[in-house]
């Protein structure tokens, strides 16, 4: 998708599907049949059948109770086995959608398409949505068509697609697995919401900072403030310069409250706290992902993003990653497929690259402060030239 949006001037679109009471509509007989088709023996099937059957529920309103009703479908939520059975039930959906770009996490199903022609993208999404709806209906599940969402990237037009019987208009941003995905794919919308949330926490710390000992203030910093930026950093790290500046400002404000120090420069506060900026932490995370790719510890979709250099000059074969040809800043330079090889090839200490285990690697870069970062956030402004690289 990034390649299509970067150099080829293509388009991308996605339909975010919403299932009505997904966990509560699982057909028990069909689930048992699917488990049998996957090779579960009779004893295992009997255990699962016993686990699901003879469940009853009733409703309490104030002091009144309804009559008991038997649960004839659905898997128990809040259990370890419930989500596993749900995933098994949904597993064969991908056989029906074998020629479709689909991502699924529990009951969140997203169809996506990319092409040089906008109409091709829209047509694929509509056709694939129909295929998905047919599978849901055949498996006793119901798609809440009115609550589906549609996103595009690469066009300024306000578009719509038909999902079943519903006409779904394009959204500017939608939440997917905790991330607010926007039309421009820069995640500024997500970070604005996140920064507002973290600012409220910092303000709460400011009100009680003077009555708390240092250790308590630092615990609040680590657990309630800094942790907010630890979710999906590889997704939002390619944000705008202004947004990165805002994140640093929040971090600095929090550190000053913890240390009750309002004069020391931000860089020195970081040293005192033995911590890094969030941008540098994100670079650490990129380095960890590249190590995992190199040592075959990553899932297939991550390994497909990168490729090793063949017999690179001056290095041992396979020690460096090939950089892709990119054409734009927004969709090319600001991407993991471009930045990952840069971090591994040019920024990471050679000693760290020689580590043999992931734990050893994490330990070796714990105190590493990334220097000469080539990303847009770390360039210097030159009058008349704009932002330029400090090095090749």
Enumerate the language-model features and the residues they cover.
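Reverse-transcriptase-like RNA-dependent polymerase core
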Residues: 1-2, 50-68, 194-196, 328-339
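Conserved catalytic palm subdomain of right-hand nucleotidyl-transferase polymerases, strongest
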Residues: 1-36
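Active-site palm subdomain of RNA-directed nucleic acid polymerases
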Residues: 4-6, 12, 83-113
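Short, conserved non-catalytic motifs in the polymerase core
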Residues: 12-16, 59-85, 112-118, 169-170, ...
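Short, conserved catalytic/metal-binding micro-motifs enriched in Asp/Glu and His
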Residues: 16-18, 35, 48, 78, ...
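Short, conserved micro-motifs composed of acidic
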Residues: 127, 142-174
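Short linear motifs embedded in intrinsically disordered, charge-biased segments
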Residues: 242-392
